[in-house]
Amino acid sequence: MTSVDLTNQLSWSRRVKDASFRTLLTMSILAALGFIFGVIYSLWNDSKFLLTKEIVVNFPSYDPDSAGFQSPIFGSIWVVSLAAIVALPIGILTALYLEEFAGRGNRFTRILELNIQNLAGVPAVVFGMIGLAFIARGPLGWGFTVGSAAMVLAMMILPVVIIVSRESIRAVPPSYKEGALALGATQWQAVRRLVLPSSIPGTATGSILAVSRAMGESAPLLLLGALAFVTFNPTGPESQYTVLPLAIFKYASDSREEFHYIASAGSLILIIILFSLNLIAILLRDFTTRKNRV
């Protein structure tokens, strides 16, 4: 066998492996998309005759003809918005401190990083138990209110926001800050004017995805007194509330078949909200990326 034959054989083997790998990736993507669209089609097929204005403007009810999701939608908006207001600034500033100002390798930083990584993997129901013991009852005693639920969801998404923000800040080329420091800028000026704006695309995308996770949570809120049927919209952090995932669960667990279709409609509404948040994250990332390039 000549060297040319050996080279051709190796080239053919590589092409086969490359084609096999590409085929496997394509099949995996198609399988994932097929599953997602299959779920969406199933929900649409069950609820297409219910997707009217009434399903959004009506309050939850034991009468399937007048049942809707107005208070769960407003409750989810209240809870998730307050959680984002609390978690996002704290998470981004913590990530900024750990990446730019904390001492590398000291014991405090290592302990803090380890705990943040561990908290990111804690089940949501554990955060609910902590909130029940220390926020709804216990030292704070806020009761079963929107504020209690928002604080628990903020604790739940905070580690994710910190980790994503750190990765985004770490991805900024070091030459940006080094150039600013060489021109006489202070470390804070370099971070505020160069590092932080350059990390906005990744930070914003990760933060919105973390908020999307909070939007779909129900387990911790079950422990915090979220009601199943609320016929009023929350008016502030001290109001009682319900959320969209919990209302969907309540309708789906009813023995009457009509409520199962209503639960499918609620699931489709939740998916639309989550897809909208993901779309906002993509558009915001693209906009900030183009702005930084200019």
Language-model-derived ranges and their functions:
Residues A84, V164, Q187-G225:
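Transmembrane alpha-helices
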Residues Q117-I157:
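Generic hydrophobic transmembrane alpha-helix motif, especially the helices
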Residues A83-I116, M129-L132, R137, I282-R290:
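Transmembrane-helix boundary motif in ABC transporter permease subunits
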Residues L98, R166, R170, P174, ...:
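C-terminal transmembrane helix and the adjacent membrane-cytosol boundary/short C-terminal tail
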Residues S3-L24, S42-A83, G105-N106, K250-Y261:
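Periplasmic/extracellular loop-to-transmembrane helix junction in inner-membrane transport proteins
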Residues G34-F37, Y41, P89-L96, V126-M129, ...:
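Membrane-embedded alpha-helices of multi-pass transport/permease systems
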Residues P60-D63, A67, L221-I271:
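Interhelical loop and adjacent transmembrane-helix boundary motif
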